Amino acid sequence: MLRPSGRAANQLRDISITRHYTRHAEGSVLVCFGDTKVICTATVEEGVPRFLKGEGQGWVTAEYGMLPRSTGSRMGREAARGKQGGRTVEIQRLIGRSLRAAVDLTLLGEHSITIDCDVIQADGGTRTASITGACVALVDALRFMQRSKMIQTDPLRHLVASVSVGMYQGEAVLDLDYPEDSNADTDMNMVMTEQGGLIEIQGTAEQAPFSEDEFIQMFTLAKEGISELCEFQRQSLTD
């Protein structure tokens, strides 16, 4: 089976993580999974949501959006429609859950970190790229908090990354781009820690049910791919 991109079944797209991409945010990253490009910023603010006031712990949340021409044809801005779409809400909740799993919220004090993920070009895997890049932006925000004496102890538990896998033309493949994603029999997104701990699995049989053996094949590919992505994260954080 030849993938449209010519990649091997277990091969990630070209990955790059560029830190300090914008000027103002406490953490900012441009993350590229092939032709999918996302700007991720992390903003540190005093205070927490109402349900956490007085609890002595912090909060991490996320917002997600796509530029109108991040895709082949222009999409209307959700702000112009006056409401977010269901897909947007689902993805930003996933990003928030994934990043909260990366930190010990009790060590943040009553501070909030808001992650903004803005897709500037989409070619499949925007949510997985967002999570992977946002984790690096989050680490930079935590480092800022330590330098500024806002917190005393590093709250980072582990790096978190995400990748897509799927069944394409009867074979398990890693890191689907748009041509594969739109024609896959199964599409799955996995979020894991750098130690291989599972945070979330989202999987859907698009064309036909998938077997337990196929699931194991996809899981194995995802675990290996996320291990590679975490190495990209570590390398970027030492630059």
Swiss-Prot record:
EC id: 2.7.7.56
GO terms (BP aspect): rRNA catabolic process; rRNA processing; tRNA processing
Single GO molecular function: tRNA nucleotidyltransferase activity
Pfam families (alphabetical): RNase_PH (PF01138), RNase_PH_C (PF03725)
Role of this protein: Phosphorolytic 3'-5' exoribonuclease that plays an important role in tRNA 3'-end maturation. Removes nucleotide residues following the 3'-CCA terminus of tRNAs; can also add nucleotides to the ends of RNA molecules by using nucleoside diphosphates as substrates, but this may not be physiologically important. Probably plays a role in initiation of 16S rRNA degradation (leading to ribosome degradation) during starvation.
Domain of life, per lineage: Bacteria
Keyword terms: Nucleotidyltransferase, RNA-binding, rRNA processing, Transferase, tRNA processing, tRNA-binding
Family: Belongs to the RNase PH family.
Top enzyme category: transferase
Signal peptide: none
Subunit structure: Homohexameric ring arranged as a trimer of dimers.
Reaction catalysed by this enzyme: tRNA(n+1) + phosphate = tRNA(n) + a ribonucleoside 5'-diphosphate
InterPro entries assigned to the protein according to its UniProt record, in alphabetical order: ExoRNase_PH_dom1, ExoRNase_PH_dom2, ExoRNase_PH_dom2_sf, PNPase/RNase_PH_dom_sf, Ribosomal_Su5_D2-typ_SF, RNase_PH, RNase_PH_bac-type, RNase_PH_CS
Protein's organism: Teredinibacter turnerae (strain ATCC 39867 / T7901)
Protein name: Ribonuclease PH
Binding residues annotated for phosphate, in chain numbering: R87, G125, T126, R127
PROSITE patterns associated with the record: RIBONUCLEASE_PH
